[in-house]
Amino acid sequence: KKEKEQGCYEDFIECLKLYDKEENGTMLLAELQHALLALGENLDDEQVETLFADCMDPEDDEGFIPYSQFVQRLMSDPVVFD
């Protein structure tokens, strides 16, 4: 099970690195929101906002977030939608 979880984490990180233009472990919050709405699971805006509130620190002054921290929190404590 541990290998499967680690593989999923690494897969998520590799996908999000595509948005990491500065190659510093951050991406624009707006790009993460777009990726979540456009790819994978069918999430609506409200679900994405819930996900961000539960799994992420606020964005910095330029709109960037550290995506590895987001993925770690999401995988350690999945968000359940009502």
From Swiss-Prot:
Does the record carry Repeat as a key word? yes
In the record, biological process GO terms are: mesoderm development
This protein's superkingdom? Eukaryota
What cellular-component terms does GO give this entry?
Answer: muscle myosin complex
Gene3D superfamilies found in the cross-reference section: EF-hand
Q: Which GO terms describe its molecular function?
A: calcium ion binding
Q: Which residues form the EF-hand domain?
A: 7-42
Keywords associated with the record:
Motor protein, Muscle protein, Myosin, Repeat
Q: Tell me, what's a Pfam family for it?
A: EF-hand_7
- PROSITE patterns (alphabetical): EF_HAND_2 (PS50222)
Subunit composition and interactions? Myosin is a hexamer of 2 heavy chains and 4 light chains.
In its UniProt entry, what is this protein called?
Answer: Myosin light chain alkali
Q: What species is given as this protein's source?
A: Drosophila yakuba
- Where is the organism placed in the taxonomic lineage, from the top? Eukaryota, Metazoa, Ecdysozoa, Arthropoda, Hexapoda
Encoding gene (name):
Mlc1
